[in-house]
Design a protein with these regions (language model features):
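N-terminal hydrophobic targeting signals that begin at the initiator methionine
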Residues: 1-2, 22
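Exposed boundary/loop context
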Residues: 10-13, 95
Length: 252
């Protein structure tokens, strides 16, 4: 089994090494791995829809493991506004900076949790002034996350909030869609998606040894991404490596 998987990994690497893998190509690769290559949909064990769902699951899992897509957004704070919606593609806030109106230097704002703010000052919600911290909360209708500033700015202390955040890529749907929002520098890591999905299918079919082999290949791909792509969260995908990282703290 190990020899077969190594040979297969090499073949797939050659096929992905020169160009981006589209959704259609990923599905074809997975069908080869799990021996579901009939050209007739009537004889395929897994529909294109099934494979697309698993590929999107893999994309989310890998992105949760390695925050490789990041961007920055900004907004101008208002004295009358306590919370501001965060982008819908936000995975996690990485850094927040504040440039007070009229100032020339941007200040980094440390994060505080809601419980940490309460422990620090039970009346924190009524405090106003120049922001020194930010906090994240879930919007009351559970559709988006929101950012708040502490203390809340007044007219004399408004400014521009700069948010660097990790992006959750769009799900793939069209056959020509490319993983990870089409980022060209992530092309070498597309193979991890087909390895992950092949492992999931082998697991579903009860082929534990083959599933483990594919998960090890996917895990190796994730580890390469971690080594090469910079800042990482304290998170380990249980499906690939068998453990989940945790972190804790007080008065954050």
């Amino acid at each position: 089994v190990k020899h077969f998987l190594k040979s297969l990994a090499y073949i797939v690497f050659l096929s992905y090494g020169c160009h981006a893998a589209t959704l259609s190509e990923l599905r074809t690769s997975i069908r080869r791995n799990v021996r579901d290559t009939s050209t007739s949909a009537s004889f395929q064990r897994y529909s294109d829809s099934d494979l697309t769902s698993l590929i999107n699951e893999a994309q989310r899992e890998i992105t949760n493991s390695v925050w490789m897509l990041q961007t920055e957004t900004s907004y101008v704070s208002a004295a009358s506004t306590m919370f501001t919606n965060l982008p819908s593609d936000l995975l996690a806030v990485i850094k927040v900076g504040y440039l007070k109106t009229g100032a020339t230097t941007r200040t980094d704002l440390p994060e505080k949790t809601l419980s940490g703010l309460t422990a620090m000052n039970p009346n924190w919600e009524s405090q106003t002034g120049t922001p020194t911290n930010y906090y994240i909360r879930q919007r009351t209708d559970n559709t988006l996350k929101q950012i708040g500033l502490y203390p809340a700015p007044v007219s004399a202390s408004t400014g521009t909030v700069y948010i660097t955040y990790a992006v959750m890529p769009n799900d793939l749907s069209d056959s020509s869609d490319v993983p990870f929002n089409g980022a060209s520098w992530l092309v070498p890591y597309h193979k991890g998606l087909s390895d992950y999905v092949s492992g999931r299918i082998k697991q579903i079919e009860g082929k534990t040894d083959e599933a483990t082999g594919y998960f090890q290949l996917a895990g190796a791909e994730i580890n390469r991404m971690r080594e090469r792509l910079g800042e990482l969260p304290n998170y380990t995908p249980g499906m690939v490596t068998g453990s989940v990282g945790t972190s804790g703290g007080t008065n954050r």
